[in-house]
Amino acid sequence: LLCRVLDGGKLGSKRHVNLPGVRVNMPSITSQDLVDIDFGIKNKVDFIALSFVRDKEDLDKLQKILNKAKSKAKIIAKIENQEGLDNIDEICQSSWGVMVARGDLGIETSLTDLPNIQRRIMHACGKWGKRSIVATHLLESMIENPTPTRAEASDVANAIYEGADAVMLSGETSVGKYPTECVKFLKSIAAKTEKFNTLDYEKNLISSSDWQHIGITAKHLAEQTNADGIIAITRTGETANLVSNAKPKGFPIYTFTN
């Protein structure tokens, strides 16, 4: 790959190369990915995040590898380019959860469109009842500083208002100077935001099964009776997930299993 430097600066090692708008004909799972996946399977990881997911077929390839190894690891689809965004509905249906990987996504699409793209992905996750993770540049300034900016605090809160199930740090905790403080700030912002969140996510949810209706009904009963919590009896955890999809407010979901 030959490049001409137009605006010079410091280039770190092992940096990614982004080609916005270009459909790159490369395998979704590389030889190094296979090594990493094998390591994860042997160490019984709970989740495997697949980068630059373009469509359902990318996820099917990974699922076949996991099935062959009899691994129970769940797949997280990282949305990082326009092709993945265009196929977001089929990707949601074929994965356990979706990550809004804002770093590469902001380069591969448009930085000014990124807030709307994030909302679009979150809406799709809510519609299909899939877990959503917002990642990258949440508290970026805390790599060097002990407190976040006001804009960063608002950004984290906005992700939670949009229905994020998880907000994930990266550089802040991997190379930052204040990893513990980052986690504490993120936890505090999330807890306080959830108390004031009045959005009804259930309206967006596709009730595609009787089980999902039961989850929604459990939420309604708990809210109407001012319950202290919801108890879900489950073997796989899916019953608790069905209740969680409706995002009940103000009380926990307790899970009992054998």
Q: Predicted regions span which residues?
A:
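Non-catalytic helical/linker scaffolds that mediate oligomerization, partner binding
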Residues: L1-N258
